[in-house]
Amino acid sequence: MGPPPGAGVSCRGGCGFSRLLAWCFLLALSPQAPGSRGAEAVWTAYLNVSWRVPHTGVNRTVWELSEEGVYGQDSPLEPVAGVLVPPDGPGALNACNPHTNFTVPTVWGSTVQVSWLALIQRGGGCTFADKIHLAYERGASGAVIFNFPGTRNEVIPMSHPGAVDIVAIMIGNLKGTKILQSIQRGIQVTMVIEVGKKHGPWVNHYSIFFVSVSFFIITAATVGYFIFYSARRLRNARAQSRKQRQLKADAKKAIGRLQLRTLKQGDKEIGPDGDSCAVCIELYKPNDLVRILTCNHIFHKTCVDPWLLEHRTCPMCKCDILKALGIEVDVEDGSVSLQVPVSNEISNSASSHEEDNRSETASSGYASVQGTDEPPLEEHVQSTNESLQLVNHEANSVAVDVIPHVDNPTFEEDETPNQETAVREIKS
């Protein structure tokens, strides 16, 4: 029985996909001399088989051409032709006995042997190299080895290191059995072997299945990630779009609550000390329609309205008009609510008091310019003042008796009564 096909051509057994890729990469990088082939390459053989019945009055020849053979891995890539001759004896088809002989026909009317090819069956307990070497020693021009019974016309690239003197190919069992039966009936069979096509690495069914499954998994994972990523981007884009629409709607409401004013000759904005619009950098002129923001900065209406829709802040001081008008936007659901924060902690009351004072100053200043036509803003100022009174009441309800440390004892006696008086005032 011949050895299994070499691992250099087919990735069989425990060979993984990574090993197959490594072999293919090395095959692509390895330089090859003319007429040679890489370990992964497989060359087929074109077979021109003809049958002629000898010693008859009719010279009848039937031939067929097919690509049914495969060159051995160590075989020379050369064409060869000759009469097919099997080993002598019914049990010697494997040619594993070193004393196996071949009955070679001679040229008609002479004792000169014709060019012949040994027809040997695979198996018998010896290697391919043993069979090919025996045929070479008996004078064969080449060796044709046909496969096991039951393998039909399956072929493999043979590995026969050391037996490189003659051409060696493998053919299928059905093809070899047909030729052998014709020879046993006395029909002379001639075969012409020519070099066929070069094929890539031979991969077995398990490797093909593994590659297919891996490709499917990678493709499915890639498509799934792409769908997930696209859906996530679409969801974020929709949420951002809703947020922007809500903010623009709030900005429109806030802009509608801001005062408009038409400048007239004699206004301080037009005088020698007048300012220019910070958006268009142009001086104010009579009959210009300006927008007055909550921070008392004025701009051309046509200049500042588009800015407020996008940014909702003063172009100069970055004052948020939504917060100044008491509009708080919830980022999560985009809802609008009027919120006045009141802190119960003494540590936060001071900062809240300062912020509310600034807000009150800006609102009162804006109210002084706007006049009495904006009742919602006055209500907001009143609610803010009430909140400030609540915070101040909570801050005044707590007192701590602390006598600070005085570094100079000379003035300690004089300062103590004043400090005690200040503490009593805090308690009251």
Curated annotation (Swiss-Prot):
One of its GO terms (cellular component) is membrane. It is a single-pass membrane protein. Residues 1-38 form the signal peptide. Its main location: cytoplasm. Its EC number is 2.3.2.27. Induction: Induced under anergic conditions. Up-regulated during T-cell anergy induction following signaling through the T-cell antigen receptor. Upon viral infection. It catalyses: S-ubiquitinyl-[E2 ubiquitin-conjugating enzyme]-L-cysteine + [acceptor protein]-L-lysine = [E2 ubiquitin-conjugating enzyme]-L-cysteine + N(6)-ubiquitinyl-[acceptor protein]-L-lysine. Pathway: Protein modification; protein ubiquitination. A zinc finger (RING-type) spans 277-318. PROSITE patterns: ZF_RING_2. Pfam families: PA (PF02225), zf-RING_2 (PF13639). Glycans are attached at N48, N59, N101. GO terms for biological process: negative regulation of cytokine production; positive regulation of protein catabolic process in the vacuole; protein localization to lysosome; protein ubiquitination; regulation of protein stability; ubiquitin-dependent protein catabolic process. Binding to E2 ubiquitin-conjugating enzyme requires an intact RING finger domain. This is E3 ubiquitin-protein ligase RNF128. The gene is RNF128.
